[in-house]
């Protein structure tokens, strides 16, 4: 075993073997593995393999060869074996995981478990390091002083700070898990911080603000230029009191902070939430942020708070956790507002207290995330998205129309500019109980139990405020209305006739559907929900079907001429044109028959049609419902499709006549209101209905068996 001489060897050359044995004997009870490279660096001239081999020899022998040489060495001022063992365990055998490198603001903190001798060896070349070692002594009840090495790479500066251990742990709780109460252990910890030197100097002055030696020094103050860096550093170091102070400062001086060249993107979600919770939506709206560094983030947190069902928000009485869209009226509603905001006329009900409630139907295809994204694409600002959403979920009551309305519909109060006119019994209207608005020719009932708002024009809703004296500014209702009026250009949505088409507003120049106070026999047992809505919609459907029927009749005689020449020959095309000319007079004759109102002609037509189509209400074309083998395939397919379309048009029209025919017949028979009241009117309707049924049975000459008993008189 060869040993090389080294000038840096602190031990005599003859004692290298003894020093190695002393080190290896102290490692006998240490758990494996052992870093033999670190052991070899302590004793020059030995390789890691030689150290491991010697360690195995000492373990197998069980005795220490340095027992006889230990006392003479100690007499000359050697190192105690216990101190050597603790030094080796702390310097060589501590796990590497004791070193931590984390971000604090714009720098890092590194806590490294290292021996004091090694630190002294590295710092001996600089006067600053030697001065820091002088401060490495204990100071009374606050424990030993800790040296913190701060390195600012951006400014190329280095500085050491000294702080008592107990004060450092109590203020910066981040170090509590790394700094042990054992004095020996604290001397072995080296703290390195990579951040701005001025920020850390501010933090250390804040930590020592209550120290007796700093009574005459001024407490450091927060400024717009340094508060963000101090906030992030203090939050990482777990300085909760300083974090709370920084958050309050940000709340009061946010406009000045965003005007400085600070990076607001380094604020994490936790700090952002705590800052945003201190802002009311009016305070957030007053923040002057030209570059939008932080204002949009505050409103994003405000939007999240609106959707929190457990959060009590002073800015918004309602929350959006139950927001949905009605598939009928297309309004966005919450669970609290769905029974107060009106829907289509057919979706009305009465609760147990006699109040009108509305029954909305949830649209399952609507997604709130897609709605917020589309709203942001439309408004281009999260601030505007918040206010639009705020106006969507909150509602007020109009003192003019006595109806609840959403805040985003504050300009949708419907009214008629002219009062309704109720003519006398001899007028041309169907019933004296029915009036008309001259402004739009819309009919209205004299006694309307629902009292729903109807009108052809809209205006602003009027909200009545409670009388209050000098404390009007502290009234929540006043503040709520003030927020609405100040941002109504963003909150309010334009009035849409499509969404209010069934609320009484006439959408076209055509006369509206006639509805009076006459009761049909089936109304004695209660009218079905949505029946009036069905009547209103069937009128528009009937108009559309009339247009479709006219188009289909014209297409019936032009289908053959649309066939291309490559599929149909010239002779076939000529014969088809001649056939079309023969059909056209039949069409005109058929139209003239429709305008004839003679009863005898109708009887003859009914008897002829009965023999051919078995009392079917639909016209059957004997020539068009057959497959013509002499024609091309395309011609027959087109004819079949047109025939199917014509049938469906006739079926739909017949169903409409079934629904509306009885009502129109009763209206035609009613000339004036009975003097006996509602009961006389009901009796007249029943008699008229029975009389019309008797006449219909007499017109159809069908032999029936003679009844055995006489028919009873209707009651």
Curated annotation (Swiss-Prot):
Phylogenetic lineage: Eukaryota, Metazoa, Chordata, Craniata, Vertebrata
Record protein name field: SANT and BTB domain regulator of class switch recombination
Comp. bias intervals (Polar residues): 614-623, 690-699
Family under the similarity heading: Belongs to the KIAA1841 family.
UniProt feature, compositional bias: Acidic residues: 552-573
Free-text note on domains in this protein's UniProt record: The BTB domain is important for homodimerization and for its function in negative regulation of class switch recombination.
GO molecular function: identical protein binding
Pfam families on file: BTB_SANBR
Residue ranges of domain BTB in the record: 146-254
Subunit structure: Homodimer.
GO-annotated biological processes: isotype switching
Main function: Negatively regulates class switch recombination or isotype switching in splenic B-cells.
Annotated TM spans: none
Gene3D superfamilies, sorted: Potassium Channel Kv1.1, Chain A
InterPro entries for this protein: SANBR-like, SANBR_BTB, SKP1/BTB/POZ_sf
Record domain SANT: where: 21-59
Domain of life: Eukaryota
Chain intervals with Basic residues compositional bias: 578-605
Gene: sanbr
Annotated segments matching region Disordered: 552-623, 689-715
């Amino acid at each position: 075993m060869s040993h090389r001489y080294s000038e840096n060897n602190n031990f005599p050359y003859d004692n290298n073997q003894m020093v190695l044995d002393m080190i290896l004997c102290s490692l006998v009870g240490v758990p494996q593995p052992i870093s033999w490279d670190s052991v070899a660096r302590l004793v020059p001239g030995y390789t890691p393999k030689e150290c491991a081999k010697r360690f195995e020899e000492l373990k197998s022998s069980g005795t220490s060869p340095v027992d006889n040489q230990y006392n003479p060495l100690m007499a000359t001022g050697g190192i105690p074996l216990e101190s050597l063992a603790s030094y080796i365990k702390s310097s060589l055998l501590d796990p590497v995981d004791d070193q931590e490198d984390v971000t604090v603001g714009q720098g890092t903190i590194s806590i490294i478990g290292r021996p004091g001798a090694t630190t002294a060896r590295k710092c001996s070349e600089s006067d600053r390091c030697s001065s820091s070692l002088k401060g490495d002594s204990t100071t009374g009840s606050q424990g030993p002083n800790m040296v913190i090495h701060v390195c600012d790479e951006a400014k190329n500066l280095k500085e050491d700070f000294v702080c008592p251990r107990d004060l450092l742990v109590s203020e910066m709780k981040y170090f509590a898990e790394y700094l042990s109460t054992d004095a020996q252990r604290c001397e072995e910890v080296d703290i390195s911080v990579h951040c701005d030197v001025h920020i850390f100097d501010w933090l250390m002055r804040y930590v020592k603000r209550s120290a007796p030696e700093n009574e005459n020094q001024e407490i450091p103050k927060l400024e717009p230029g340094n508060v963000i860096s101090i906030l992030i550093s203090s939050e990482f170091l777990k300085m909760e009191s300083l974090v709370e102070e920084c958050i309050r400062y940000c709340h009061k001086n946010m406009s000045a902070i965003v005007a400085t060249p600070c990076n607001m993107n380094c604020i994490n979600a936790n700090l952002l939430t705590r800052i945003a919770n201190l802002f009311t939506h009016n305070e957030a709206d007053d923040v002057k942020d030209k570059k939008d560094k932080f204002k949009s983030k505050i409103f994003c947190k405000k939007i999240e708070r609106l959707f929190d069902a457990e959060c009590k928000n002073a800015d918004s009485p309602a929350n959006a956790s139950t927001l949905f869209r009605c598939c009928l009226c297309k309004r966005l509603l919450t669970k609290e507002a769905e029974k107060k905001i009106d829907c289509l006329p057919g979706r009305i009900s009465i609760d147990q207290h006699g109040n009108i409630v509305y029954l909305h139907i949830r649209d399952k295809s609507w997604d709130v995330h897609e709605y917020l994204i589309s709203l942001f694409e439309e408004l281009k600002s999260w601030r505007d998205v918040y206010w639009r959403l705020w106006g969507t979920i909150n509602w007020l009551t109009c003192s003019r129309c006595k109806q609840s309305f959403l805040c985003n519909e504050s300009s949708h109060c419907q009214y008629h500019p002219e009062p309704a006119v109720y003519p006398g019994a001899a007028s041309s209207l169907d019933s004296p109980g029915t009036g008309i608005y001259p402004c739009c020719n819309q009919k209205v009932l004299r006694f309307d139990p629902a009292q729903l708002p109807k009108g052809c024009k809209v205006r602003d809703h009027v909200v009545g405020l409670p009388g209050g004296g000098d404390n009007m500014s502290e009234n929540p209702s006043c503040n709520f209305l003030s927020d609405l009026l100040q941002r109504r250009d963003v909150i309010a949505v334009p009035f849409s006739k499509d969404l209010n088409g069934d609320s009484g507003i006439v959408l076209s120049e055509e006369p509206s559907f006639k509805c009076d106070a006459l009761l049909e026999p089936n109304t004695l047992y209660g009218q079905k929900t949505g029946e009036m809505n069905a009547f209103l919609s069937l009128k528009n459907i009937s108009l559309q079907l009339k247009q479709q029927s006219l188009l289909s009749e014209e297409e019936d005689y032009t289908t053959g001429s649309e066939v291309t020449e490559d599929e149909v020959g010239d002779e076939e095309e000529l014969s088809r044109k001649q056939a079309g000319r023969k059909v056209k007079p039949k069409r005109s004759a058929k139209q003239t028959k429709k305008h004839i109102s003679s009863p005898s002609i109708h009887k003859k037509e009914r008897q002829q049609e009965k023999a051919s189509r078995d009392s079917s209400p639909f016209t059957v074309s004997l020539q068009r419902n057959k497959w013509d083998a002499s024609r091309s395939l395309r011609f027959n397919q087109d004819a079949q499709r047109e025939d199917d379309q014509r049938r469906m048009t006739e079926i739909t029209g017949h169903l409409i006549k079934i629904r509306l025919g009885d009502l129109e017949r009763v209206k035609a028979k009613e000339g004036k209101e009975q003097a006996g009241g509602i009961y006389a009117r009901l009796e007249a309707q029943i008699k008229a209905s029975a009389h019309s049924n008797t006449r219909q049975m007499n017109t159809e000459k069908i032999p029936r068996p003679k009844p055995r008993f006489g028919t009873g008189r209707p009651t």
